[in-house]
């Protein structure tokens, strides 16, 4: 039965990764090219030109790999162990798992270290940023767990109380942001264009997780095998 969970997670990840890769190959790459073109207007040097087809192929391939990783790790292994604890059932539970995955992998870290356009220089050293990113991933995982526990503990309360209790642990993210060291960035791109770039990256990641959850829900639950349905016969 565990194999069925892994297969469904891989299929959902493959579909989500393919959609994400296509998004990157079209919208994401076009946005990046626009940012780099703007940046080149403020510099005197030129970098090597990469073929557009090659760039698109790399984007699609990278998206598929990310999708497979998240699909197998989160919706294969994770869903196998966490399914009974997830809030709701069916698509609701899968969307909750996707939200927890996004918050852990990207959402919480990006509150401290948002994605930056090409050419931006960051004040913090690379090792410091990596450690900070890993730490905020841990915070995201803890917050996600706290949200699920709050949801389950308020099962018999009113909807408003349950919703408030479930969302309350998200306030811990503000504490993490306040305690994190500042990371000033500098670059030739205007603030509005940089913000649009970041939101494009966020939209792509949200779409990746949502697509994996939707496809995983469409695949349904793994069927129990005959051996798992049978009961031991009593001795005469």
Question: How would you label these PLM feature ranges?
Answer:
Residues 1-236:
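Juxtamembrane/disordered regions of integral membrane proteins
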């Amino acid at each position: 039965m565990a194999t069925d969970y892994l297969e469904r997670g891989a299929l959902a990840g493959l579909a989500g990764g393919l959609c994400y890769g296509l998004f990157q190959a079209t919208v994401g790459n076009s946005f990046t090219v626009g940012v780099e073109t703007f940046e080149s207007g403020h510099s005197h040097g030129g970098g090597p030109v990469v073929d557009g087809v090659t760039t698109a192929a790399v984007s699609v391939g990278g998206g598929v790999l990310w999708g497979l990783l998240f699909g197998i790790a989160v919706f294969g292994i994770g869903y196998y162990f966490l399914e009974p604890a997830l809030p709701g059932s069916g698509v609701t539970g899968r969307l909750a798992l996707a939200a927890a995955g996004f918050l852990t992998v990207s959402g919480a870290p990006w509150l401290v270290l948002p994605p930056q356009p090409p050419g931006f220089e960051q004040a913090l050293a690379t090792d410091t940023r990596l450690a900070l990113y890993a730490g905020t991933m841990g915070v995201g995982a803890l917050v996600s767990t706290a949200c699920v526990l709050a949801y389950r503990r308020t099962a018999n309360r009113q909807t408003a109380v349950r919703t408030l209790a479930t969302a309350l642990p998200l306030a811990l993210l503000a504490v993490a942001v306040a305690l994190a060291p500042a990371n000033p960035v500098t670059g030739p791109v205007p603030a509005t264009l940089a913000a649009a770039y970041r939101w494009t990256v966020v939209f792509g990641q949200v779409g990746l997780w949502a697509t994996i959850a939707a496809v995983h829900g469409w695949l349904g639950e793994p069927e129990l095998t005959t051996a798992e349905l049978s009961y031991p016969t009593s001795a005469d």
